[in-house]
């Protein structure tokens, strides 16, 4: 078995060592990746690739993996340079920025390391929306908010989605008057229709009860909010319980859509709808999550 061990510490060159055996090879490399997402933190990542190839084919796999990592970091940088989520939903991204992001999306999609993403364990988890195409439902919903209300009155700060056990829960975080926070939650059911294709059926929409940030409330509104709070306390218990649990809207049988997963790894998810419009999502890490990415290639 041929063993290739490449170490890339910081700015040093890649070092490869080959054994003389011509049997199927194990390909292992340690790659410190500079995370260029929104946190801008530098972390060390270990990447292991198991390759059933001869010694002559292994460097090609190494080169392809380096190309994929480079394309991924390039996309994250392009998203940041385009102004991020806020610039996208407010329509502040330029045509040049949009075409640049779309070009990098296409470059990364062709290097997709997951052949059957719809059934991959990597698909499940909590994802943050980073990019919508011009016809995306998420972008249309966001622009409705900004067109109806100026940014000083309403602000969509973040959109995320939790995918687990063939169910999805998308959450939009909204802030009103910079002092009242609320969430719009859209629940849906996912049905696998192929290695790349899924059907999403919307089940329920919910508007959570707003939370007031008292220290951020403008002086001219404190009296009105105080009166509203007093009025709510005087409502019957049944109505108060209903308001506390949020306003729920049944959606079963009303809306559905089809989409395909064009790229999936441990950090990035790219989907396209029936019009080919891309959405880019990045995984939301928890404090206990690891920084180890394991990818296997079989040939």
UniProtKB/Swiss-Prot annotation:
It holds the Pfam family PAP_fibrillin. The keyword Transit peptide applies. Residues 1-48 form a transit peptide. Its main location: plastid. Keywords: Acetylation, Chloroplast, Plastid, Transit peptide. It is found in: Plastid, Chloroplast, Plastoglobule. GO terms for cellular component: chloroplast; chloroplast stroma; chloroplast thylakoid; cytosol; plastoglobule; thylakoid. It comes from the Eukaryota. InterPro entries: PAP (IPR039633), PAP/fibrillin_dom (IPR006843). This is Probable plastid-lipid-associated protein 13, chloroplastic. The lineage of its organism: Eukaryota, Viridiplantae, Streptophyta, Embryophyta, Tracheophyta. The gene is PAP13.
